Amino acid sequence: MKKTPLLNIALSRVIASLGHGDILMIVDAGMPVPAGVELIDLALTRGVPDFISVLDVVLSEMQVESHVLANEMAEVKPPALQVIESLNLEDQLGQQRWISHEDLKVLSRKAKAIIRTGECQPYSNVALVSGVVF
């Protein structure tokens, strides 16, 4: 059995397969997933699992070089934003970039995989760009 927090087989496989610059998205329950992009659907019910819990576990295994958020997130200020801001202060998410929600949907077409959570707070979505550990 693995010693690290992440137990989900599909998610563990995707993170292990990421190369430098690959995109992994963590999204709320309402974010559309483009055809052809792998979906890891963790959603069980509204709020389960929440965005913050999934982000925390993903970061335990993924080296992040940068991340992309929707401008609308800054306007709505879901709880996930405060956590992301704290992680930025700890330099766990690399450089931050803001784009429109519509542009984030376009960017999702380039994702290696999208992790769907049960989060129902609007605009609780992030595109994580994989870095390297060396």
From Swiss-Prot:
Record: active site: H20
Name its species.
Pseudomonas syringae pv. syringae (strain B728a)
Q: Which UniProt keywords apply?
A: Carbohydrate metabolism, Cytoplasm, Isomerase
- Which reaction equations make up its catalytic activity? beta-D-ribopyranose = beta-D-ribofuranose
Top-tier EC class: isomerase
One GO term under biological process is: D-ribose catabolic process
Binding of substrate occurs at D28, H101, Y123, S124, N125
- Give the record's subunit note: Homodecamer.
- Recorded family membership: Belongs to the RbsD / FucU family. RbsD subfamily.
Starting at the broadest rank, the lineage of the source organism is: Bacteria, Pseudomonadati, Pseudomonadota, Gammaproteobacteria, Pseudomonadales
- UniProt-listed NCBIfam families: PRK11797.1 (NF008761)
InterPro entries the UniProt entry points to: D-ribose_pyranase (IPR023064), RbsD-like_sf (IPR023750), RbsD_FucU (IPR007721)
Tell me what this protein is called: D-ribose pyranase
Q: What is its EC number?
A: 5.4.99.62
Principal subcellular localization = cytoplasm
